[in-house]
Every structure is written in structure tokens, then in C-alpha cells.
Amino acid sequence: MKFNVEIHKRVLKDLKDLPPSNLKKFKELIETLKTNPIPKEKFDIKRLKGSDEVYRVRIGKFRVQYVVLWDDRIIIIRKISRREGAYKNP
């Protein structure tokens, strides 16, 4: 089952601040999400409380939040930030 991965424009802007090793891991995450929306065996992924569709991935000191729209087979990467600010609203 193939998923379409969409990256929010704010995330694209924030990627410029990512260290090269974390950027490489982020790209690996995107490729993996296309075929496996919750790759727990490969990444540190947890579902966020209060939602069945929102997940977070730990990449070093950064957190990536994404939404899985199961019926539409779409994954939206909606936020990437340091751990300190990851769970606050934008």
C-alpha cells in the first residue's frame, strides 16, 4: 500500500537548520513512510495522545510530527522542531 507524503511549507523552511546527519535521517524517514506509515522497527515513533492520526518521530534532538490520513493514503509532515518546542502550537 503506497502513501503520498506531503511536506508542509513551514517544514521545508525549517529543514535548512537541520544538521546534515539529521537531514539524511529525515530523507530516509520520508522514503520509508511512502510504504510504511508507522515504521516502529526502524524509527522511534509514538502516537500523540488525543489523536489516532498524529505521530511523532525522534531524529536526534529534533521531533517530526506527521498526520496519517488512512482513507486517502496521505501522510502530511506538519512540523519539525527541537525537542524543547516540539509539542507547543506554532
Curated annotation (Swiss-Prot):
Keywords: Toxin-antitoxin system. SUPFAM superfamilies: RelE-like. Coiled coil: none annotated. Signal peptide: none annotated. It comes from the Archaea. The keyword Kinase does not apply. Toxic component of a type II toxin-antitoxin (TA) system. Its cognate antitoxin is RelB1 (Potential). Belongs to the RelE toxin family. This is Putative toxin RelE1. It comes from Methanocaldococcus jannaschii (strain ATCC 43067 / DSM 2661 / JAL-1 / JCM 10045 / NBRC 100440).
